[in-house]
């Protein structure tokens, strides 16, 4: 279990809303704008469009409207950088301090979620900008060490796929320490933005996308890019490790078949997407209601977001909506969900010294390897005892220099002595051979054989010394390579400290300072507006009784309008719930028919006694969604079956 800093204060899910510009299809349909935003007051006003064919009887009544208030709102002319600096950066900074953080995009298909989260190469979205911020921070934290690991997973038709390895049918597991996690999901150490960009590009190429009437590149799956950031800091001589987990989630959009024109596989995908989003909506509702049972396990998406919704995480919901009147129902539904979500209370805490942190283990492993290498180098002493050659033997970056021979000082002296003796023996043998050619009696055959035997022994001794030195060389190279491989997993700040990057980082910091000033100006402006509203209220209190009566009458009319709006909203909610119930009833009826059909087939072809035997050894595995059968040595009831 990781230690938490303090008890962890309550922190509501933050919600920001972004509206995209009109697209060509909406312009061709003659759609009107129904979204009005006040960036200062953080309000979204949704205007109900006047229905076509409405006569003069309704012309006196203004279209109804609904006002929502969120943590931040962004009109269609807002930029990616503006959205990131003002809303998303706070989540990233929390992760850098050791909190879990989640940023997820929510909205109907074609509303701009993927554009906001991913963006384009020349206009990066929240995910690339998040990593830019992470490595800016790492470059500035001079005395801290960092280990950053990334993974990319897709939920397609309720199947988990690793987008970086292609592995499918991954399983969800739950652990008292880790919480909910994906078994066998690959984690990739990353050292800079370019490395992460490659992973994102590789993962996006594997994502399921398809064209619909609403979106030419509609995401047919949910994707989660997860980053684990381990940070080691020395405080008062003690090493402190904090681990932040960042989930960047791009949800597939909710769909209506009559608008998307989905058929075949697209329709099946849409059904799975809508089911998981309905479960997400149900989880949000239950959390707001304070229900004891939260149906996280009803879908893989909600199980993975379990900590993000009501748990140990700072969470930002990025709501994407369309401005067009043709999407009024979907926009209203999206804004309602978002309005509920902002009431969810999380309990984020700093994750200190978790047991599964890898940075200390990796650092200790590197230290151990360096000690082993130093021992080998000290023993070998570069073959000469020279400090200069010893330093040249290993460059500290996994490369062994030419100065490292692999011999110890004693071995080198011994080999040199053996080589001198061998040289003398060879010369003596040549001399003996020449003497025997001139006179066979000058040198006996025994003397020559003894000399040849001595030469062989010397050669074997030299070869044995060379073999040991070679083994020592190979061992040193292997250890040096392991050191470099493990060091490469840690973020190398030298790579992040190039001149161009430092300039860009300085610009981003200046930009952030301007954002802080802008936020302060917006806060003061909001206070002035509220003060003006209070002044007007005081003026109302000082009016004459007649004016007060008129004011009361106006308020009464306003309350009547609000009551009408609430009734209409209630009617819409009931209609939406009725549609959802109808979908669930249809699905349930189909499942019942399928079960009855299977039962009928079984009853026709499998005798009842065999059915009972099969049922007695069968058990259902909820986690793996599969039947398991107990093996028994004998089953009398099954005798002769098949």
Swiss-Prot record:
InterPro entries: Kinesin-like_fam, Kinesin_motor_CS, Kinesin_motor_dom, Kinesin_motor_dom_sf, P-loop_NTPase. Residues 12-344 form the Kinesin motor domain. One of its GO terms (cellular component) is ciliary basal body. Residues 415-475 form a coiled coil. ATP binds at residues 107-114. It comes from the Eukaryota. Signal peptide: none annotated. Mg(2+) binds at residue 114. Keywords: ATP-binding, Cell projection, Cilium, Cilium biogenesis/degradation, Coiled coil, Cytoplasm, Cytoskeleton, Flagellum, Magnesium, Metal-binding, Microtubule, Motor protein, Nucleotide-binding, Transport. GO terms for molecular function: ADP binding; ATP binding; ATP hydrolysis activity; magnesium ion binding; microtubule binding; microtubule motor activity; plus-end-directed microtubule motor activity. Belongs to the TRAFAC class myosin-kinesin ATPase superfamily. Kinesin family. Kinesin II subfamily. Involved in anterograde intraflagellar transport (IFT). Involved in flagellar assembly. This is Kinesin-2b. It comes from Giardia intestinalis (strain ATCC 50803 / WB clone C6). The gene is kin-2b.
């Amino acid at each position: 279990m990781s230690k938490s800093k303090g008890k962890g204060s309550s922190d509501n899910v933050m919600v920001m809303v972004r509206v995209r510009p009109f697209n060509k299809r909406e312009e061709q349909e003659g759609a009107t704008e129904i979204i009005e935003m006040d960036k200062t007051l953080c309000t979204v006003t949704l205007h109900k469009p006047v229905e076509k064919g409405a006569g003069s009887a309704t012309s006196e009544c203004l279209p109804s409207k609904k006002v929502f208030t969120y943590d931040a709102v962004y009109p269609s002319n807002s930029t990616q950088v503006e959205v990131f600096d003002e809303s998303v950066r706070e989540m990233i900074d929390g992760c850098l301090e050791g909190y879990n953080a989640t940023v997820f995009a929510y909205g109907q298909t074609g509303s701009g979620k993927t554009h906001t989260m991913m963006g384009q190469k020349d206009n990066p979205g929240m995910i690339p900008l998040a990593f830019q911020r992470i490595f800016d921070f790492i470059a500035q934290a001079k005395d801290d060490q960092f280990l950053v690991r990334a993974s990319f997973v897709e939920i397609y038709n309720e199947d988990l796929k690793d987008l970086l390895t292609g592995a499918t049918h991954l399983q969800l597991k739950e652990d008292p320490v880790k919480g909910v996690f994906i078994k066998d999901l690959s984690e990739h150490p990353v050292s800079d933005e370019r490395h992460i960009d490659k992973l994102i590009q590789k993962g996006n190429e594997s994502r399921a996308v398809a064209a619909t009437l609403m979106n030419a590149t509609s995401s047919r799956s949910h994707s989660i890019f997860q980053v684990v950031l381990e940070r080691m800091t020395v405080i008062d001589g003690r090493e402190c490790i904090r681990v932040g987990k960042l989930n960047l989630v791009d949800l597939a959009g909710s769909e209506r078949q009559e608008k998307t024109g989905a058929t075949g596989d697209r329709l099946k995908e849409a059904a799975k997407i809508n089911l998981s989003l309905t479960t997400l909506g149900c989880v949000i509702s239950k959390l707001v209601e304070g229900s004891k049972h939260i149906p996280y396990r009803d879908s893989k998406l909600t199980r993975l977001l379990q900590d993000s919704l009501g748990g140990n995480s700072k969470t930002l919901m990025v709501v994407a909506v369309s401005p067009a009147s043709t999407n009024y129902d979907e926009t209203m539904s999206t804004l309602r969900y978002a309005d509920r979500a902002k009431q969810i209370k999380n309990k984020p805490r700093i994750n200190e010294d978790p047991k599964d942190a890898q940075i200390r283990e990796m650092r200790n492993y590197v230290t151990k390897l360096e000690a082993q290498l130093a021992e080998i180098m000290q023993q070998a002493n570069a073959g000469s005892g020279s400090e200069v050659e010893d330093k040249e033997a290993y460059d500290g970056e996994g490369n062994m220099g030419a100065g490292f021979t692999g011999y110890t000082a004693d071995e080198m002296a011994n080999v040199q002595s053996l080589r001198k003796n061998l040289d003398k023996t060879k010369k003596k043998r040549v001399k003996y051979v020449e003497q025997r050619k001139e006179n066979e009696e000058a040198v006996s055959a025994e003397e020559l054989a003894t000399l040849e035997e001595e030469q062989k022994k010397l050669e074997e001794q030299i070869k044995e010394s060379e073999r040991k030195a070679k083994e020592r060389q190979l061992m040193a190279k292997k250890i040096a390579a392991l050191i470099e491989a493990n060091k490469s997993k840690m973020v190398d700040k030298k790579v992040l400290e190039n001149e161009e990057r430092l300039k860009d980082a300085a610009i981003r910091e200046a930009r952030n300072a301007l954002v802080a000033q802008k936020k302060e100006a917006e806060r003061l402006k909001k206070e002035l507006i509220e003060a003006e509203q209070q002044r007007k209220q005081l003026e109302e209190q000082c009016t004459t009784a007649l004016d007060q009566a008129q004011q009361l009458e106006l308020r009464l009319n306003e309350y009547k309008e609000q009551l009408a709006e609430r009734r209409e909203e209630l009617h819409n909610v009931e209609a939406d719930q009725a549609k959802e119930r109808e979908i669930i009833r249809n699905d349930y009826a189909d499942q019942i028919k399928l079960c009855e059909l299977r039962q009928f087939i079984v009853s026709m072809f499998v005798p009842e006694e065999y059915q009972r035997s099969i049922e007695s050894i069968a058990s259902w595995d909820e986690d793996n969604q599969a039947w398991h059968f107990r093996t028994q040595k004998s089953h009398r009831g099954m005798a002769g079956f098949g």
